[in-house]
């Protein structure tokens, strides 16, 4: 049967984004501690009040008067993000092995103000950018799902919009964190946004940024509703997929993967008899890290335990109604790695289409979310 697996929703992620799972973490999840010190790269002096957090989690703190920080993290991999006003953002990949090393020294480089001024001067900043592009940004950054509709951007004034007619591109920058209240999932999200770029000609988005989650306070009824909604958001997400690959439980968790072959402009699904062999799955017993690379660059992802949202079916009238269909494009010949918590890399090298592209920030859960 011929099936067109292409969908018009496409998004490229450069950070640990939409990573959820049906892989159940144990209540006795083990932790490790990452310690370090934040200093000025030029002077070597400690920086007090630097924001240090594990990206896409609820775990973070500010450095103390000596520039020191200490984070306890559930087993797995993370991207550690360090920000400080007037300095360039620093990121580093960490896992349990990092905690076995000496205290990290994080050197932050002061921003080059002259270069920043010149860059802004020659760009095409849109006057009243929020009034003109705010709705578009919200739909493509927060999303259009039912949970996205319950998100509120608290400080849109920090956003600056730049449109390039020559490149047919809209870029959004922010010097301060963008604050978003997600009343559907019970989180306040603080986004350190490097840039959000929409390419109109390819209908694709590129987001470079670092979210931190803060749990909202609510009464028992609110907490119960948030828990219910988080469980819904958890199903069929990218981390559910990655953790299912990691634990070799794709079928049990409701996923089916197929390779997609294009022949004369038509996409044909190829059923995989030896799924993990086709992914070249390999577990490193010493690091507990899984590496894989699909034999085919385009992989269709079918999730059977939840139907697509009504609004998605209205936006894409060709979509199937009884399962969620996405595809992921992997670069040929590149190996990917998955940590025990579903963190995978390099994430900047994949493109998600279809239902996974439809789900955006409004459906995000933090890495340290554990299903009940």
For the regions a protein language model found, what residue spans apply to each?
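A short, amphipathic beta-strand motif
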Residues: 34-40, 67-69, 106, 118
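A short, solvent-exposed loop/turn motif at the edges and junctions
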Residues: 54, 81-93
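Short, ordered, surface-exposed loop/turn motifs in non-cytosolic proteins
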Residues: 32-34, 41-56
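Bacterial N-terminal signal peptides
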Residues: 11-22
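Surface-exposed, low-complexity/disordered segments
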Residues: 104-372
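Structured interaction patches on ligand/partner-binding surfaces of diverse proteins
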Residues: 61, 88-104
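Beta-strand-rich domain onsets/edges
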Residues: 24-33
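Short, acidic Ser/Thr/Gly-rich low-complexity loop/linker segments typical of extracellular
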Residues: 57-68
């Amino acid at each position: 049967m011929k099936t067109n697996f292409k969908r018009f929703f496409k998004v490229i992620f450069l950070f640990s984004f939409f990573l959820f799972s049906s892989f159940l973490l144990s209540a006795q999840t083990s932790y490790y501690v990452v310690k370090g010190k934040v200093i000025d790269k030029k002077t070597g002096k400690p920086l007090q009040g630097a924001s240090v957090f594990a990206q896409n989690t609820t775990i973070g703190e500010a450095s103390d008067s000596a520039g020191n920080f200490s984070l306890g993290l559930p087993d797995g991999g993370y991207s550690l993000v360090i920000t400080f006003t007037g300095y360039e953002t620093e990121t580093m990949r960490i896992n349990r092995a990092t905690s076995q090393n000496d205290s990290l020294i994080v050197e932050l480089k002061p921003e080059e103000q002259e270069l920043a001024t010149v860059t802004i001067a020659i760009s095409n900043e849109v006057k009243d950018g929020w009034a003109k592009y705010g709705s578009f940004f919200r739909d493509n950054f927060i999303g259009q799902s039912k949970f996205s509709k319950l998100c509120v951007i608290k400080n849109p004034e920090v956003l600056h919009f730049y449109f390039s007619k020559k490149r047919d591109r809209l870029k959004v920058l922010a010097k301060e964190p963008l604050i978003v209240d997600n009343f559907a999932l019970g989180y306040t999200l603080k986004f350190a946004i490097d840039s959000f770029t929409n390419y109109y000609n390819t209908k694709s988005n590129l987001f470079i940024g670092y979210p931190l989650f803060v749990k909202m306070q609510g009464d028992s009824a609110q907490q119960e509703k948030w828990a219910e909604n988080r469980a819904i958001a958890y199903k069929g997400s990218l981390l559910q997929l990655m953790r299912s690959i990691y634990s070799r439980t794709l079928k049990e968790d409701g996923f089916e993967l197929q390779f997609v072959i294009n022949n004369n402009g038509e996409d044909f699904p190829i059923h995989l008899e030896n799924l993990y062999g086709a992914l070249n799955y390999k577990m490193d017993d010493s690091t507990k890290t899984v590496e894989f690379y699909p034999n085919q660059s385009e992989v269709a992802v079918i999730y059977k335990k939840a139907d697509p949202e009504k609004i998605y079916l209205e936006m894409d009238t060709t979509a199937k109604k009884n399962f969620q269909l996405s595809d992921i494009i992997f670069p040929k010949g590149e190996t990917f790695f998955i940590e025990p918590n579903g963190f995978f890399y390099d994430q900047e090298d994949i493109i998600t289409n279809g239902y996974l592209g439809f789900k955006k920030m409004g459906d995000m859960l933090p890495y340290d979310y554990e299903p009940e």
